[in-house]
UniProtKB/Swiss-Prot annotation:
Gene Ontology cellular component annotations, sorted alphabetically: basolateral plasma membrane
Species classification: Eukaryota, Metazoa, Chordata, Craniata, Vertebrata
Protein's UniProt name: Organic anion transporter 7
Database matches in Pfam families: MFS_1
Glycosylation sites: N39, N56, N62, N102, N107
């Protein structure tokens, strides 16, 4: 008998689990868009230097008479190499001679120019305000915009480590509620930040709590459902996050002011925090951490809400201890992250898996965090990317079961790299083609992530699987944090970050064949089993345990 048998007695998927799952999925739906908010709140609108004669309507009317805005622009702003008005330079004084195009005058490149000492004028046709227009994060300060995204992702990295440990020590429910409140306060406050430094600090704290919320949503769903319903619960959580992306695109289209959009996704978190008081703590965690009385109380509460009062009354401490004997013994075995590197074969697997996860997450977040670089209609891109992630689950299921782990990851990582490189060199004018290639890249990146998760779980021994998942998660989050930081390289070349994303994906595809295939192979239970394995030589045991991948 095991804990899953206790759950079967109190109801494997009853009203209690459905209500719990509903609240957690809503939390995923509202939380996930906070990762992508800066696609809109930090969008860069068209801009040019503020010029007295051009942008001061009263003075320009008095001084220039009937000159059109285009004529005023011509004498005030120089042209760049593409014959478009410069965004970061202006003429030191009006160049009246440029009005007469037939007249001979010195080379335009010899005319005196200066930086935008009086600030900028922004195009408000798409975004009425963003953090870029609020704090002039353009030209010499454009790298600061990438720093805001980097700090949020760095917060996710640090938060996943800190809150992951605290969740195991103090409980999933408590940390989940604390993180909901932290995200609500910090991102609501960010909408009113008086300076850019304060805004970045608040976004770092918001990222600190975001990953913990998403992780604990999945953990609480898994720990309160029996195995046959766990994949369904996790799938619903993933679909809720995808739906959150679609809703973000729609609301951002309707709300073009960054303060309002920030509040629309932050204020509902206060309601979720208040609602989460009815969320149940994981009974499994309570029992394993030597709090069996509280665990028994939660199980009886679940039985009562599921309409199984008799089953709840039959639960006693003796029954509980008997059912949880194996789990309690397993919990006494303490593992360390250093155990992952003590033996050569496991060390090799962890290092290779870490690079694959790093490259995969860098490319994935490089795509989803920088929609504006892919095309003009960022709202449609956001909705499309959320939509293509839904069928990606089915593609991953088919690939894992028919192509295997090695082939599927290698194929889709190569395809991801090629897609990103194609986006880089497709002209901006070919918007339909850019949109199609970008959507393909997002779908493929989602497939590779799911394949990587499955492969990683099957390559690590049972005694260290959770520890290995945590370490690989750190490698993943480092890649995610570096993705926005690489956009600083656009000052040297607009294509350079995208080339790095694409090349990293291809390198990841080259690394995957160095890992053993695990399809229909027994899961290793100990480090010794991992060390005895040889690539392509281990025979599957008919009676062995293996991981079955479903469409969920």
């Amino acid at each position: 008998m095991a804990f899953q048998d206790l759950l079967d007695q109190v109801g494997g998927l009853g009203r209690f689990q459905i209500l719990q799952m509903l609240l957690l999925c809503i939390s995923s739906l509202i939380t996930y868009p906070h990762i992508l908010l800066e696609n809109f709140t930090a969008a860069v609108p068209g801009h040019q230097c503020w010029v007295h004669i051009l942008n001061n309507n009263t003075d320009s009317a008095n001084a220039t008479g009937t000159l059109s805005p285009d004529a005023l622009l011509r004498i005030s702003i120089p042209l760049d190499s593409n014959l478009r008005p410069e965004k970061c330079r202006r003429f030191s004084r009006p160049q009246w001679q440029l009005l007469n195009l037939n007249r001979t005058f010195p080379n335009i490149t010899d005319l005196d120019t200066e930086s935008c000492v009086d600030g900028w004028v922004y195009d408000q046709s798409i975004f009425t305000s963003t953090i870029v227009t609020e704090w002039d994060l353009v030209c010499e300060s454009q790298s600061l915009k990438s720093m805001a995204k980097f700090l949020f992702m760095a917060g996710m990295l640090v938060g996943s480590i800190v809150y992951g440990h605290l969740s195991d020590r103090f409980g999933r429910r408590l940390i989940f509620r604390c993180c909901l409140l932290q995200l609500a306060i910090t991102d609501t406050s960010a909408a009113f930040a008086p300076t850019y430094l304060i805004y970045c600090s608040l976004r770092f704290l918001a990222g600190f709590s975001t990953m913990s919320i998403l992780t604990n949503c999945t953990v609480l769903i898994v720990e309160w459902t029996v195995p046959r319903f766990q994949v369904m619960g996790m799938t619903l959580s993933i679909c809720a996050a995808c739906l959150g992306q679609i809703i973000l695109g729609g609301l951002a289209f309707a709300i073009r002011d960054w303060h309002t959009l920030q509040l629309v996704f932050s204020v509902p978190l206060f309601v979720l925090f208040l609602s989460s008081r009815w969320l149940a703590e994981s009974a499994r965690w309570l029992i394993i951490t030597n709090r069996p009385e509280e665990g028994l109380k939660e199980l009886k509460k679940a039985a009562h809400r599921n309409g199984r009062k008799n089953a709840g009354d039959a639960l006693t401490m003796e029954v509980l201890r008997s059912a949880m004997q194996e789990e309690l013994e397993a919990a006494q075995i303490k593992s360390s992250v250093f155990d992952l590197f003590r033996t050569p074969n496991l060390r090799k697997r962890i290092c290779l898996l870490s690079f694959v996860r790093f490259a995969n997450f860098m490319s994935f977040f490089g795509l989803i965090l920088h929609l504006q670089y892919m095309g003009s209609n960022v709202f449609l891109f956001q909705v499309l990317f959320g939509a293509v992630n839904l069928p990606a689950n089915c593609v991953a299921f088919w690939a894992l079961n028919h192509l295997g782990r090695q082939v599927s990851q290698t194929l889709f990582l190569f395809l991801l790299g090629i897609s990103i490189l194609a986006i880089t060199f497709v002209p901006q004018e070919m918007q339909t083609l850019r949109m199609a290639v970008s959507a393909l890249g997002i779908a493929v990146s989602s497939v590779t992530l799911m394949c990587s998760f499955a492969h990683g779980n099957e390559l690590t021994p049972t005694v260290l699987r959770v520890t290995a998942s945590g370490f690989l998660g750190i490698a993943s989050n480092i890649g995610a944090a570096l993705a926005p930081l690489l956009m600083i390289l656009t000052v040297y070349s607009p294509h350079l970050p995208w080339i790095i994303y694409g090349v990293c994906s291809i390198l990841g595809g080259l690394v995957v064949p160095l890992l053993p295939e695990t399809r229909n192979k027994p899961l290793p239970d100990s480090i010794q089993e991992v060390e005895k394995e040889r690539k392509d030589s281990r025979k599957a045991k008919p009676e062995g345990t293996f991981m079955k991948v479903t469409q969920f």
